[in-house]
Amino acid sequence: MSLPKDLLYTEEHEWVKAEDGSYIIGITDFAQDQLGDIVFVELPEVGDTVTKGDSIGSIESVKTVSDFYAPVTGKVVAVNETLEDEPELINSNPYDTGWILKLTEVEEADVTALLSSDDYEKGLD
């Protein structure tokens, strides 16, 4: 299982990457493996304000449909529109081309509450 050290994580298997004042978000390698082959992703709308813990979309695989939750509060400034035609990118590269959305205006307290890669990995055992 791939687990980049430079990302932050949630217990719900989302990852968060700080980049130039914004935060890129996706699901972890563990999560995509549990879901199986992903066939559809419902994305939030650019301009939406999302609240930590709220369902902001869904990920459909051959096994199940799973809600995707906001790991932090913020404003959606971009979504990975490539996933509309190629949702399997989440399976093949969840930390790069399989990213899901980008937020700004993020609550700093939400970021500090996220898990390090070591703490996230301990929770998987």
From Swiss-Prot:
The reply on keyword Membrane is no
Question: Which superkingdom heads the taxonomic lineage of this protein's source?
Answer: Bacteria
Q: What are the record keywords, sorted?
A: Lipoyl
Q: SUPFAM superfamilies of this UniProt entry?
A: Single hybrid motif
One CC-aspect GO term? cytosol
Q: Which cofactor does it need?
A: (R)-lipoate
Q: Which GO terms of type biological process are on file?
A: glycine decarboxylation via glycine cleavage system
**Free-text cofactor note:** Binds 1 lipoyl cofactor covalently.
Q: What does this protein do?
A: The glycine cleavage system catalyzes the degradation of glycine. The H protein shuttles the methylamine group of glycine from the P protein to the T protein.
The entry's family comment says:
Belongs to the GcvH family.
Name of the protein in question: Glycine cleavage system H protein
Q: Which source organism does the UniProt entry give?
A: Listeria innocua serovar 6a (strain ATCC BAA-680 / CLIP 11262)
